[in-house]
Each structure stands twice: as C-alpha cells, then as structure tokens.
Amino acid sequence: MSNPQPDDSNNRIVAVTLDEESIGRSGPDIEHERAIAIYDLVEKNLFAPEGAGEGPFTLHIGITGSRLMFDIRREDGTPVVAHLLSLSPFRRIVKDYFMICDSYYQAIRTATPDKIEAIDMGRRGIHDEGSRTLQERLAGKVRIDFETARRLFTLISVLHWKG
C-alpha cells in the first residue's frame, strides 16, 4: 500500500516580479529569455514553501547586498516568508552560463548546425548545474521540481549578472 501523494495543484506560483533595482541592462536575447522563463514558470511549476500550507503564491525575486531574496506571498499579498540565499554558490555557474550564452547567440547567426548543437548542449549542462544548485539551496525551505528550478535559475541569472 502506498502513501497518498499530496495534492500539489495549489502549490504553485501564479505571479513573479523581479526587483527592478537588481536588474542590470540586458540585451534583447537576455530580455527574451527572461520573459519566456517568467511565462513558462507561471504556466507550469511546483512551488511549496515548507510549513506555509497550500498556495497559490506570488514570488518577488531580488538581490539584497550579496544575497538572493525570495519574497513569497499569498495571492492576496499576505506575506508568507522571505528567504535570503548566499549568491556565492551561483557566481561561477552564472559567469560560465553567460559566457556560453554569448557563444551560443553568436553561433546561431553564423555557425554550422553541429557547432550550434554542441554549444547548446554545453549551455543546457551549465543551466542544469545551476538548477540543481538552486534546488539544494532551497531544500528544507521550498519544495520545487527540476523544471521549476530551471526557470528560476534563468531569472536568477538575469538578476545576478548585475550583482
């Protein structure tokens, strides 16, 4: 006999905002990636802050000093919890991610399909590493699935680039 799984249909993010003070000027490729990540995140995600009960939730992401801030609220704006995470574990990953993204965006304009595919595989690998790191940093604080972690990592990368 298996244990029933919790109903996660309400454990999700319904709105995401990024701290405008934390966002640096980005090129159109990065802005496009950010918009897609927000759209995809809101469309499909698993986000369950520990001890918060059921959602849905809103999430405001920003950089405060050298920390990543997740300000989690209920849909009506009632505060749930704010988590501050050190940016140190993300610095190298984000730097590598942006370097390979630059290579990828240059390659899609001029390189062969094989070269583009090789760069894209590397880009996805670094993105996966950042996503796993985020899941580890949120363990015991917020339960998220891997796809949610991937979309959140994209947004963190945009913020961290300025920080």
From Swiss-Prot:
Give the family per the record.
Belongs to the UPF0262 family.
- Which HAMAP family does the entry mention? UPF0262 (MF_00678)
Record-linked NCBIfam families: PRK02853.1
Tell me the Pfam families matching this sequence.
Answer: UPF0262
Q: What is this protein called?
A: UPF0262 protein RPB_4349
